Amino acid sequence: FAQADLQPLATVKLNKSETITVKQLKTRASFIQKQYGMESLPIEQKQALLENLIAEKLITQAAAKEGLSVTDSQVDDAFLNTFSQQLGTRVSEAQLEDLIKKQTGKSLDEYIKEYSGMSKSEYKAYLKNQLIIQQYVFSKKQSEIQAVAATDEEIRNAYEMNKSTFVWNDMMKLFLVMVPKGSNDMAARALATDLRNKYKGDSKKSEEIKNSNENGTNYRAGDITVAKTAQQAQQLGWSIDKLNELFGKSAGYLSEVTETASDFQFYAVLKKYDAKMLSISDVVQPETTVTVYDYLKRNITSQKQSQYFTEAAQEISKSLDIPSNVERKKTGDALKKLLNWQ
């Protein structure tokens, strides 16, 4: 099998000679299977993936020929954004490594391999290529992509088709303070108590607490909107009973300092919002300016631009896919034989 993995499938030579092997295709296939929960891929889909890899190399080589590149820090940002979005908070690579180790007992590299089928370095190389492709295609089609936008009819039709999903649950605006336990539970409890006493003495001190240099290092403090849902309770590390108890409180209520598995925290109820169905002109979240109409316009525009971008990338790669730039080493039955792995 190791010998077969080294078999070359195609060579892209627009700017330099790069060979795509069976092993590289297997890695990409594994990535797709992990992303979509698939046990295996049919040969036709593997062939399509091979064509995608050829297209990617054509565009990245064309970009290199024109002097386009991305920095390691841009790649690292894209890498961390992938996980920060999942976690709901910005993390460094060291913090991510520590978090993964605590939650799964695995190293970051092991976790990424399980999650994507790629090693960390392979995953970063994949992200780097995607960033270069985005940059190159956008440089060629910027005005056309930016001109793509949702129409009023598309927005209103989308609202009518999804009207039942635009609702407010019962919600509250809270001032929430969380002090991580770290290695000293007593010190964390003492800090949480001090911050609560400061707020209790003068609720305007919340701005001082939020703007302190300690916020984000020794503790986390801020205003959040909490919905009366099981998912929200899980995100906060609260029981359903605690969340229901919260929604029984009135604006102005200040909780005691409570302990969770990872921190000490307290909250103050700032405002309450009743559940309701949203019209197309209502704001999506309390105390924001984005309406349902704005939200749909942005999402539909983004979807249309993404679709246009994909088509533009395919068009560009097709124009570059000529015999002098690509040599397909295996075709027909010979290719299918190499792709017949489970």
Predicted stretch roles:
Residues 2-125, 283-292, 304-307:
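N-terminal targeting/tethering segments
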Residues 4-6, 33-44, 106-201, 235-342:
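PPIase-associated folding chaperone regions across multiple families
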Residues 65-66, 191, 195, 215:
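Short alpha-helical scaffold segments that flank and stabilize functional sites
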Residues 72-88, 228, 232, 322-342:
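An exposure/low-complexity boundary signal
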Residues 80, 160, 211-214:
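Short amphipathic alpha-helical surface patches that mediate protein-protein
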Residues 197-233:
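Ligand-binding pocket segment of bilobal, Venus flytrap-like solute-binding proteins
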